[in-house]
Structure formats: structure tokens, C-alpha cells
Amino acid sequence: MKLAYYPGCSGQGTSAEYERSTRAVCRALEIGLKEISDWSCCGSTPAHACDHVLSSALSARNLALAAAEGAERVGTPCPSCLANLKTAKYRMQDEAFRDKVNALLDNPCPEELPETVSILQVLVEDYGTGAIAEKVKKPLEGIKVACYYGCLMSRPADIMQFDDAENPMAMDNIMTALGAEVVPFPLKTECSRDTAARLTGRILERAQAFGADAVVVACPLCHMNLDLRQRQAVGGSMKMPVLYFTQLMGLALGLPHQELGFEKLCVSPDELLRKIDAAQAAKAAAAKADEATEEAKA
């Protein structure tokens, strides 16, 4: 499987661990990622907050570059990039809007632009959770996780066209395939951006109340709010690890820690990792004891 790849700007800096673990997981699953040549920023939130035409022009340029390279689909790990790229294509169905966008570009966009999908969608819908489960070498048994999607991955539904907008399950299903226990989490699509950090704190507190050992995300901005600003959000030290779903996937697939970027997390995942190791050791010891019992009976 091959895919044109749009990394997004945050993957080059604040969410480098997401970028690193995404590439590592895709390599392990033999999903080829061909980075779009000369890609540029999609504008993120500031661009579309200022000017919809400018925002669409920034995204359309990247889609046009992918089209010129023969791509039919573009994959990106970042929900903000995903939303901008998909929204640009959606708006450019209107000829008058497309003309305004093309007026800002050196080269007009083709009428048919590639489809944009999230890496999460590719893993769930194209690769499949059953196939992922077959690749697991180190099951995530013994841990409970709360999957937090944020507000962009599946909304607005008519543009994103992925998962259930109110109760998405893609990450839940992947975590289950990896052997983790997924706790119920009614705040999974609430926005984590709040000037007083009240909602961010509420998300973390509810995850803890439901028994989660970690919060799993697929969004760099969500990760920053829940990990970097955790102390501010909860008014103290909660020590709730917040990991990208690709980091836990890589761990379950048996990939080296250095390929997954655990060292970049603000809240240390060491206790979580020890819990996984302990569950594996207990399982191995139980299997060895059963084997010894069977031998004794023989």
C-alpha cells in the first residue's frame, strides 16, 4: 500500500514524536509514505480564521503538488491539516471560489484534486484492525486507556466523512486490537481548547475517574493541551500519561522505544511501560507454570 504523505508543520517540531512513530508504524506494516515534494504549511487555524480563500489556497497548493506527482490520495496524521485539506477541496467544488483560489496561486489547480485521509483512517479502513492484531508482538495487556479524539477528526461530518462524529471508535478499535482495555469516555470529542484550561482539566479528571492509565490521542494540539499543560489544567500533579496512538501501536508491534519518541513526552510514560512489562512477565510465568504442570502429569 502506498500513499502520498503530508507531514504537517507540527510534525517537524512540537509533535516530532507523532511524526516519528507514524513513520515507524507505517514501515512496520509496509504502508509506503511518499512525502509530497516542496509541501508547505496548510495555514492551520490562523489562516481560515482570517480568510477562507487564503486558507484554501495554502491547502490547494499542496493537493495540486500531490496531483502533479500522480497521487490519488493524500494521507496526513494531523486532524487540523486533514480538516484544512479536505475543506479546501470541498469549497473548490464551487467554480467562483475556485477562481479566487487560483488567482492566488502561481499555477492553477486541476479540477480533480486528490482525496485526503487521516493515517488513522488508513489504518482502520484500509489495513484493518484484524490485520493489525495479527502483527502484535507485545500485547498491551494490563493497561486501561481513554481514547480522546478532540473536535476535528470527524467533524464536520459532511466534509470529514470518517467515523461517527459524536462517538468515534477508530482508536478504540485499534487499542482493543493491540490488547489494551478501552474505558468508556463520554468526553472523547469535546474540544480541549479553553482559556482557563477548565475543559482540559475536566477531560483528564474524567479519564482518571474511569480508571484509565493513559489518554490516547491523534491530534498534536490535543496532545499539547493534555500533556504539556496538564499541571496547569488540573491545578497540580496528576501524572496522567498522554500518548499518540501510533506510539502505543509501535510498542505493541515490538518496535524500539527510540523510534517512538517516548522521551519527548512531558508526563513520563515509564510507569505505564512498566505495567505493560509486568503483565507480559506474569503471562509468561503463568504459561511456564502451566507447562510444568502438564509435564508433571505426563
Question: What name fits each language-model region?
Answer:
Residues 1-298:
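Iron-sulfur cluster-binding electron-transfer modules in prokaryotic oxidoreductases
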